[in-house]
């Protein structure tokens, strides 16, 4: 009797209709990770709403980026929707390229993550990384980053350690995303000079008049992508939720809008997501392609039936 090769069988389990296979009890709960970033809050909220509509339980743990990658490797985290590239290149090389963590798919294109300054600093002539050192006193020789352990912070520290762009005597200030943006707000009120980590998608691009510095591609890369990652073997063990997570595709406008609604208005990431999906129902057909409810039912009907 002919036997399917192991790799073909694994692909069939993932790509075929998940309802044809008995799902392991461990798949009933999907464990996601959140590094405390606004973009991942809204993409996690989207994934959680869809998964819960299909009959799954969702647990979201707030963890630092190094702990998230370690959790994926050790099987303590099922999936992470925040694999920013090239910002996470070192983590990719250590965990993904080595086969300890798997990629389910790319969920966003066109991202940017690099140092930025307020518009009034740009107008004064600071356009490139090379322009910073000459104005060190005005910047108080500080580069404002985000949470400790973030890959972007590591890139800044490498730049300082190498005295790149003459920044060897500068200091990295690590804080949460929210604290960094609060510092930006205070600086803007006083027209104080500040250089900080900026990125898109994020409502900071709407709320603040900022400009991205040029010339830092060696450390921050150019336009990037965000990938959905999973623990090794997750797609084979839990093909239905893995298929949904692999199907998720976002765009910059959607994420900026959802984050703005959640951060500036009265909406939470979850309520902002539901409102967006009700206004944009056609996206569900692509996201739910090849997916069923946990009991094998119609996924589209299950999601559309939610209040």
What is each stretch, according to the model?
Residues 44, 61-99, 183, 203-209:
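Pocket-flanking alpha-helical
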Residues 47-54, 136-170, 278:
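Ligand-binding cleft/hinge of the Venus flytrap
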Residues 21-31, 134-140, 287, 302-306:
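Immediate post-signal peptide segment of exported/extracytoplasmic ligand-binding proteins
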Residues 99-152:
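A conserved helix-loop-strand patch within extracytoplasmic ligand-binding domains
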Residues 25-39, 56-61, 140-144, 245:
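Short, well-ordered beta-strand elements
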Residues 77-81, 151-218:
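Ligand-binding pocket segment of bilobal, Venus flytrap-like solute-binding proteins
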Residues 108, 251-307:
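C-terminal functional modules
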Residues 112-123, 225-237, 261:
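A bilobed periplasmic-binding-protein/Venus flytrap-type ligand-binding module shared by bacterial periplasmic
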